A protein has these predicted regions:
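N-terminal ordered "arm"
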Residues: 1-2
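Active-site and NAD+-binding cores of ADP-ribose-processing enzymes
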Residues: 60-192
Length: 192
């Protein structure tokens, strides 16, 4: 969690500001899938490294006022320290602006991960963070939910997912070529 403390804190503050019900002093929310295409969570995928531990899938129902929904693909933008653009052109302008200031995308990513800072990057991050509220616009077909806790009476089903030949619940599987999906690029496809 420390690697992405700035984006996580942003979501936590949004939950508190929006008065998402159920907060009893929990430090971190529970992250869950809310929509993945025509399903609730990602389909199982072939596991290429076979290093998965057993997983548990908990299906639960919460009242709307206890859930903060965000766009998974847009959230990937803030994990990388990027803007959450409204249009492809806005994103292109963002990249041009960074280039003119000799800031590379990895500088923003390092800032978000609290690995390094400098005054120029910090100034740019203030502008970047002003776009982060757009993760709640739900533009793509993959949504995640944050809740403060799950009560026993909200649970509908518990499944043990222990087949190491498959990955469950991930949108970032390691591909045969050693890469992972680029969610920022996929998010841009949903924009005008």
């Amino acid at each position: 969690m420390q690697k992405y403390q700035i984006p996580y804190n942003y979501v936590i503050q949004k939950m508190l500001k929006n008065r998402i019900k159920g907060h009893d002093g929990e430090k971190y929310p529970v992250w869950a899938w809310a929509k993945c295409g025509n399903s609730i969570c990602p389909k199982k995928r072939k596991n290429l490294n076979h290093k998965q531990q057993n997983k548990v899938k908990i299906t639960f129902i919460k009242p709307d006022n206890e859930v903060l929904l965000s766009d998974y693909m847009a959230y990937s933008c803030i994990l990388s320290g990027h803007i959450v653009p409204r249009t492809k052109q806005e994103y292109e302008n963002f990249l041009k602006s960074l280039k003119s200031k000799n800031i590379v995308l990895d500088d923003l990513k390092a800032f978000v991960r609290s690995q390094k800072t400098n005054p120029q990057t910090e100034k740019e991050m203030i502008k970047v963070q002003k776009t982060w509220h757009r993760i709640f616009d739900l533009k793509s077909n993959v949504h995640q939910a944050c809740v403060w806790h799950i009560k026993a009476d909200e649970i509908q089903k518990i499944e043990i997912l222990n087949d190491s030949n498959y990955l469950y619940g991930t949108m970032n599987p390691l591909r045969a070529n050693g890469t992972r999906p680029d969610w920022k690029k996929r998010y841009l496809k949903f924009l005008p």
